[in-house]
Amino acid sequence: MRVAFVSSEAFPFAKVGGLADVVGSLPQALQKQGVEATIFIPWYWGLEGYYVGDGYFNFAGGREKFGIGHLGHGGVRYVLIGLPDFARDKPYGYDDDFRRFVRFQMAVAELLGGFDLVHCHDWQAALLPLLRNLGWFRGRTVYTIHNLAYQGIWGSQDFYAWTGLPGETYYGGGLEHRGAINLMKCGIVNADSVTTVSPRYAWEITTPEGGEGLDGVLRSQRWKLRGILNGLDTEYWNPATDRYLKHTYSIDDLSGKYQTRAELLAEFGLEDRSTIGVVSRFAHQKGIDLILEAVPGLMELGVNLFVLGSGEPNLERSFAWVADRHRGRIVYVQGYNEPLAHRIYAGCDGFLMPSRFEPCGLAQMIAMRYGTPPIVRAVGGLIDTVQHWETGFLFESMDAGGVWWGVNEFLKHPDRQQVALNGMRQDFSWEKPAGQYLELYRGLVAHG
């Protein structure tokens, strides 16, 4: 079976968030089960692909040329789509993002002949199921929602001038939502199957509270909606072989974890107390502001905080301020540092994730694999992966009191080492999720 994956991100070539980890890992796992996988991503600035030729697509009344490049990683072929729009410093954050990714998808559609199935990821690939239904290419389509909050919304006049699509697709093709083009809705309505990244999140997005304005659409399409829990790259995230750890360790010998902890605290001047790690984007979704509000209570509980992350400038400034005020108890490192992230997962005693919503979450899986019990809000994929008092700690309230309660539960557990060992025994590999996707693919292709 030949399967094309279309995404704006794929590790290790383009990563902003967890989408990249999924698209980088799932095809590799599927290849081990007999799938011939190809990943299509934009040819971002700095990617050193092998140029193989040019392609053409119709856009805004003219004929547009795009470059085609190839890369390989983990036995999977990557196809790079070269457009001038993507020769920039970062994948997103530009006023013309919508237009850029519409062009990307129209170019990709020209190369999808011969695939049995096309697996589209988030709004940046959500137009493709409609293009398939309009006859641009053949093969079945799966659309995966990684984060419903980002929907790809734009005015209709520009869109139809660019694409030349039939005007009746505005309503009949599922593009219209609340008076604008909504690519997320388009993908949901037109794909043969819709998945999201955890069973709990698949339910949450059908509710008014979690549906981001699309809950009615999702309820109407519930018959083809399925939650498949993401896996983790357990070869990369492995405390026994981690290249970023000076002292590796395993479930049978935790001495390397204790050495990593001692060196981490000493290097950053933290007191020898229970230390809670945070590795996160500073975004409203992640509940980072709740940690700030909980700082006085957490200091009274006697824990340290070690925070690595960046994002909203006001949160960065606030963490820098509290870290300065609580020297020896709070460390804040701005930005993302891969080696330091590994040391935090390994060297902290607990790991905090107070997310407002969390489609799946990978950090809690990594923390458990590294023997660091996660303290998480009971939402989305966190519910599906963490068992309270068994492999970690869950709290309900979306406020500073909830954060305090979760950390206090962690502190009062009589055998936190057993919780850590239970977490290390969990299987978060891609083998099971890949099998579930393969079952889905086979069913769709057989009835295509």
For each predicted feature, which ranges?
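Catalytic cores of nucleotide-sugar-dependent glycosyltransferases that transfer UDP/GDP/TDP-activated
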Residues: 1-448
